[in-house]
């Protein structure tokens, strides 16, 4: 009976050691994913934020005299693109702050709520970036193909550079969305493992 009682603390200690090693690997993976996600969302924000094109187009004729107008396409003209820039910019700031927390603030854990708060915030950022990327992708498709039922004409045949740059901003945003989803999943798994190895979860 005494030998069984002595084996149990060793088993618990070895289990906690394995979990601590796994958590360290998870922290390293999350750190790398956050760096790449930050670069992706920052790239998407900058590329879309600088997206504009000016063209002089033929809008009509009077007799044989052509009438031309200079038009400018800017991301600010489309609310979906504005939201895209805000969403990716917010995700960039969030990832930058979380990088600082991961590197310098690991000891700051108020009553064990650090992982809970981070997991919730990760899910919120995933939702925000998903909304921004999907709304911008919808408007990009509308600009490329138009909508014959609603009588909305396409514009990408006139503003090619604007559409290409907008499409280029969507790519890193969707890459960041995938990375943020992975980060959120790892955060939840880490939180779950922490609960399993907490003193309250161990049986006497």
UniProtKB/Swiss-Prot annotation:
UniProt topological domain (Cytoplasmic) ranges: 1-28, 102-114, 190-204
Membrane topology: Multi-pass membrane protein
Top-rank lineage group of the source organism: Eukaryota
Main location: membrane
Membrane topology (Extracellular): 50-80, 136-168
Annotated GO CC locations: plasma membrane
Subcellular location, record wording: Cell membrane
Residues annotated as transmembrane: 29-49, 81-101, 115-135, 169-189
Ubl conjugation listed as a keyword: no
Alphabetical keyword list: Cell membrane, Membrane, Transmembrane, Transmembrane helix
Family: Belongs to the Casparian strip membrane proteins (CASP) family.
UniProt subunit comment: Homodimer and heterodimers.
Entry protein name: CASP-like protein 1B2
């Amino acid at each position: 009976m005494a030998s069984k009682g002595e084996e149990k603390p060793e088993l618990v200690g070895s289990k906690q050691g394995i979990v601590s090693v796994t958590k360290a690997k998870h922290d390293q993976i999350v750190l790398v994913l956050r760096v790449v996600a930050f670069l992706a969302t920052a790239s998407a924000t900058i590329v879309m934020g600088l997206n504009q094109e000016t063209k002089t187009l033929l809008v009509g004729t009077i007799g044989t005299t052509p009438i031309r107008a200079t038009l400018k396409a800017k991301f600010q003209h489309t609310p979906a693109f504005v939201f895209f820039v805000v969403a990716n910019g917010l995700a960039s700031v969030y990832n930058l702050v979380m990088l600082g927390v991961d590197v310098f603030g690991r000891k700051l854990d108020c009553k064990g709520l650090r992982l809970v708060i981070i997991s919730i915030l990760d899910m919120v950022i995933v939702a925000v970036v998903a909304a921004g990327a999907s709304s911008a992708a919808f408007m990009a498709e509308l600009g490329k193909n138009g909508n014959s039922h609603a009588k909305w004409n396409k514009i990408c045949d006139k503003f090619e550079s604007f559409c290409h740059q907008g499409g280029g901003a969507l790519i890193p945003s969707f890459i960041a969305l995938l990375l943020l989803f992975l980060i959120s999943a790892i955060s939840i798994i880490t939180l779950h493992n922490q609960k399993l190895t907490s003193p309250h979860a161990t049986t006497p």
